Amino acid sequence: MTQAQATSISTTSLQIHTAPDDRLVYVLVNDPLARPLFEELAYEYSSRYAGLIDTDEIAREMQRYPVEAFAPPHGAFVLLLRDGQAIAGGAFMRHADPGTTEFKRIWASRNHRRQGLARRILTELEVNAVRLGYTRVFLSTGPRQPEAIALYQTNGYTLLSAHDFGEDQPPGYLFEKHL
């Protein structure tokens, strides 16, 4: 996808805004450029799930997958940099189901929200998943993340299940999309 194509993607109420020096880079999850993503995600999860999820559990979740899970040839980790700083990012890895990839850690910095950056990352992940031969995306998000739920619903993802805390199922919203 070219810069011009990325900046022209829109929905009825959201235009993707990019600065002239924005650039997408592929790195490993342990690259220092990725640190702000994980720090801000941990803060976000701690804020949204205070009293529901222990902070130690959040820290474990941030380290749950080995570096190789989000690396070629079966995955990738992309950051959107502005002025050399990560302002958005996301990853994908091979899922247990053949032909399926799982998207993880799709994020936009809280100082750069409502600019369509998460949508840009989502699109970039989809394009690269297709290049690697994946035909289906699976992803999950938490019940206290309405922005993520809306992002997936407005980008053609089908809701498979939705459960909140206190139900007899693990909490989370599960989605899929056939590429």
Where do the PLM segments sit?
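Active-site acidic-Proline motif in GNAT/NAT acetyltransferases
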Residues: 109-111, 115, 143
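Conserved amphipathic alpha-helical interaction elements at protein-protein interfaces in regulatory
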Residues: 127-131, 158
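Acetyl-CoA-dependent GNAT
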Residues: 17-104, 109-110, 122-124, 128, ...
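N-terminal acidic, proline/glycine-rich, low-complexity intrinsically disordered segments
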Residues: 1-8
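Short coil/turn segments at alpha/beta junctions that flank glycine-rich nucleotide-binding fingerprints
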Residues: 115, 131-135
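C-terminal "cap" of GNAT-fold acetyltransferases
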Residues: 3, 29-30, 135-138, 142-179
